[in-house]
């Protein structure tokens, strides 16, 4: 999906909030603050006029209109109406926010509900065709690199392990220097799968730029559709995640990224399911060999 296609693909219902969060990336601090206020449950319950919103946020009415248009709406009323529909349709799956003094049972229930909400919102805007196009190129590629930093690198290691089970070899690199060395050797017909929540990590961006320059295709899993790394990508798989107290945004992002990559993995496996099953039996037998009691 191109940047222009994303900008025009305004979703309805539960998919609206994650779409707006992704559009929020790259906005100024004041613009972003307006989006956060609008997305907070309860703030639009009394159908406030644009004047009321401007006063509540200490900004001009013109700024509210500007943000509405940046989000893809003709004006504030149109945006407010869409958000009212969103909150009406999603009230059953929107958990109340975590508090610092909650009872243990409430904490556990809310964490589960936040995860469920993240998965449902991600599913509502997922581009299935983009996943299948990316999966086909990944499967056919000569060399497959996996790039990510911090927690995203741990996800890349999981992806490498998952694909090795079905005989699709790919390599995750834990060090930025090794990542760059590998990128320098890539060529046309190769692919990089990059996992980056922000889409702005400098080390990862440098490796992706080099891989792109050398002719490799880029598949990007990211929350930020308009980020520098996403703009380098040939295939973008959106991973929107809400930010919550205590958990932040990374916890929700990790769960959704793993789910999207599971879908990506199955899409790749389906391209040659017979061979995938044969290879799973082989690799599974080796793992079983090292299980307790197997060496007796």
Swiss-Prot record:
Its biological purpose:
Regulatory protein involved in rpiB gene repression. Also involved in als operon repression.
Keywords per UniProt: DNA-binding, Repressor, Transcription, Transcription regulation
Q: Which InterPro entries match?
A: Homeodomain-like_sf (IPR009057), HTH_RpiR (IPR000281), RpiR-like (IPR047640), RpiR-like_SIS (IPR035472), SIS_dom (IPR001347), SIS_dom_sf (IPR046348), WH-like_DNA-bd_sf (IPR036388)
Annotated CDD domains: SIS_RpiR
Q: Name one GO molecular function term.
A: DNA binding
One annotated GO biological process: carbohydrate derivative metabolic process
List the protein's name.
HTH-type transcriptional regulator RpiR
| Pfam name, any one | HTH_6
Q: Do you know which SUPFAM superfamilies this protein is assigned to?
A: Homeodomain-like, SIS domain
Q: Which residues form the SIS domain?
A: 134-274
Q: Which residues bind DNA?
A: 50-69
Q: Where is the HTH rpiR-type domain?
A: 14-90
């Amino acid at each position: 999906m191109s940047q222009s296609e994303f900008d025009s693909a305004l979703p309805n219902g539960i998919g609206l909030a994650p779409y707006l969060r992704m559009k929020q990336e790259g906005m100024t601090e004041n613009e972003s603050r307006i989006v956060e206020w609008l997305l907070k449950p309860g703030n639009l319950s009394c159908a406030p006029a644009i004047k009321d919103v401007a006063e509540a946020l200490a900004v001009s009415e013109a700024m509210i209109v500007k943000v509405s248009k940046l989000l893809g709406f003709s004006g504030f009323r149109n945006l407010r109406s869409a958000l009212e529909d969103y909150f009406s349709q999603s009230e059953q799956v929107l958990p109340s926010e975590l508090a610092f003094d909650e009872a243990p049972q409430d904490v556990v229930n809310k964490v589960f509900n936040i995860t469920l909400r993240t998965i449902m919102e991600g599913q509502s805007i997922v581009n299935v065709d983009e996943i299948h196009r990316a999966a086909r190129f990944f499967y056919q590629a000569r060399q497959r690199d996996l790039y990510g930093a911090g927690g995203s690198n741990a996800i890349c290691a999981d992806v490498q392990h998952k694909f090795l089970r079905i005989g699709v070899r790919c390599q995750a690199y834990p060090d930025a220097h090794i990542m760059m060395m590998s990128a320098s050797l890539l060529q046309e017909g190769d692919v990089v799968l990059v996992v980056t929540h922000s889409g702005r990590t400098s080390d990862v961006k440098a490796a992706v730029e080099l891989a792109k320059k050398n002719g490799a295709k880029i598949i990007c899993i990211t929350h930020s559709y308009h980020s520098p790394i996403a703009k380098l990508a040939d295939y973008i798989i959106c991973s929107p995640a809400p930010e919550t107290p205590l958990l932040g945004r990374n916890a929700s992002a990790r769960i959704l990224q793993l789910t999207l990559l599971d879908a990506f993995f199955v899409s790749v496996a389906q391209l040659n399911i017979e061979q995938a099953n044969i290879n799973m039996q082989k690799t599974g037998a080796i793992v079983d060999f090292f299980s307790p009691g197997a060496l007796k």
